[in-house]
């Protein structure tokens, strides 16, 4: 049997670190997930071992808080954008070897604290759904730059099936996603 729960009861939210592009490099101490790069090459997942595009680095002299370090299965969430349509993009962070990685400016880390109730991959799909994004947008503030505060996201209630069902749903959605990616790649080859 599932349950209805507020995100803030099962997740913590942390703001990313502000590092300008001029201080990003091809090599360094930490991988750095820059907000602008999320829209150009990543879709639902950020796989550190096999990234869709190169991930830049920052040096160890940057002022980084421990809360800005990404952990495997965190969700990198976009809560600031120049358009309302770009709010609410979610990216599951896959980093099984725990390479040191920092979440960047204008991103929010969503960390699942209750994995006995929530499968991070399931939550990532849920947070990417049109229904969730509609709910999220009711909290939008701003005129030129649009924002949603993490405390507002924490108030959003979600229905959770049992974790076994969440795993089954993720397996189905992952298979569909993989097929879509393969088709996109094939279409890219055909149009070239």
Where are these regions (language model features)?
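A short beta-sheet element
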Residues: 34-36, 60-128
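Short aromatic-glycine-enriched beta-strand elements
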Residues: 29
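A short glycine-rich beta-alpha junction/loop motif
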Residues: 19, 100-108, 140-170
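Non-catalytic DNA-recognition/assembly elements of restriction-modification systems
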Residues: 1-18, 155-192
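Short glycine-enriched loops at secondary-structure junctions
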Residues: 38-39, 96, 141-142
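Sequence-specific dsDNA recognition surfaces
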Residues: 8-25, 37-82
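Well-ordered mid-protein domain cores that form the structural environment of catalytic cofactors
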Residues: 128-129, 137, 159
């Amino acid at each position: 049997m599932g349950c209805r729960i507020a995100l803030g009861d099962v997740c913590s939210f942390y703001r990313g670190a502000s590092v300008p592009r001029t201080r990003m490099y091809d090599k360094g101490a930490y991988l750095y997930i820059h907000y602008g790069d999320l829209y150009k090459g990543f879709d639902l997942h950020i796989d550190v071992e096999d990234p869709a595009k190169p991930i830049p680095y920052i040096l160890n002299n940057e002022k980084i808080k421990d809360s800005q370090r990404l952990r495997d299965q965190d969700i990198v969430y976009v809560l600031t954008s120049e358009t309302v349509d770009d709010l609410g993009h979610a990216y599951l962070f896959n980093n099984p070897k725990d390479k040191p990685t920092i979440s960047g400016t204008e991103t929010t880390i969503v960390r699942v604290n209750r994995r006995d109730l929530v499968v991070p991959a399931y939550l990532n799909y849920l947070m990417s759904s049109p229904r969730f994004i509609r709910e999220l947008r009711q909290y939008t503030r701003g005129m030129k730059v649009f924002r949603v505060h993490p405390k507002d996201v924490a108030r959003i209630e979600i229905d959770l099936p049992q974790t076994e069902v969440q795993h089954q749903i993720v397996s189905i959605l992952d298979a569909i996603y993989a097929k879509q990616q393969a088709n996109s790649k094939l279409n890219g080859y055909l149009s070239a």
